[in-house]
Amino acid sequence: MLQYPQIDPVALRIGPLAIHWYGLMYLIGFALVYAFGRRRITSGHTTSMTVRDLEDLIFYSVLGVVLGGRLGYVLFYKPAHYLANPLEIFYLWEGGMSFHGGLIGVIVVMLLFAHKKRLGFFTVSDFIAPLIPLGLAAGRLGNFINGELWGRPTDVPWAMIFPQSGDGLPRHPSQLYELGLEGIVLFALLWWYSSKPRAAGQVSAMFLMGYGAFRFLVEFTREPDNFLGLLAAGLSMGQWLSIPMVLAGAGLYLFTARPPSR
């Protein structure tokens, strides 16, 4: 069993202001997206997007992630609670974000952005898809530092005891699994896959399939939300939300891979 490194969730204090690691990870994630996106633009990988376009897209994507992530959590995970306590929807400091909701928020942003810039939607989504795992990796590291979203009890040699779980049981460090698969591995795969010319929509399709598949697998080691538990077929909410992603990605890939009709 490995020792969980208890890290102060506050990264920096400036007088009464406390900067938490989790919020800092969000900033680092967006900074990485900007850095690697700028590199692709300046290297001539794309002629459709400019650095200014990237800056605008990231700015509006922050809004999409926050609003979509919060509303996704409200609708997917605790609809009854927030229906009875609607003002708590705005209590962002209490936590509660959904990746799948955040993704929907970013898709809406990309649709509006593509329309405004007169670009094809897949031109935008194929450009940004390989960069999203960088933000995911930073976010999962923030989860690990916070000691939250831990895994299920296990006896594997690398199990850890997360103090906030309250039961003292060794558990999977599922945050690190997600960091590795949904973050590092998915980024490497998409960066390589998108380095060559692809039909419009195929990079986006690979992201949907890759993230959905990795999230589905990791959920077998992740402790389900205590207010939901496991749902139909013994699957978690995260798994049920990931299945449509994989199916949509597969359908999009097959559709875009078809030769043009004559």
From Swiss-Prot:
Name of the protein in question: Phosphatidylglycerol--prolipoprotein diacylglyceryl transferase
PROSITE patterns in UniProt: LGT
Positions of disulphide bridges: none
The keyword Transmembrane belongs to this UniProt entry's keyword annotation: yes
First-level EC class: transferase
Annotated organism of origin: Bordetella pertussis (strain Tohama I / ATCC BAA-589 / NCTC 13251)
Pfam families associated with the record: LGT
Coiled-coil region list: none
Keywords: Cell inner membrane, Cell membrane, Membrane, Transferase, Transmembrane, Transmembrane helix
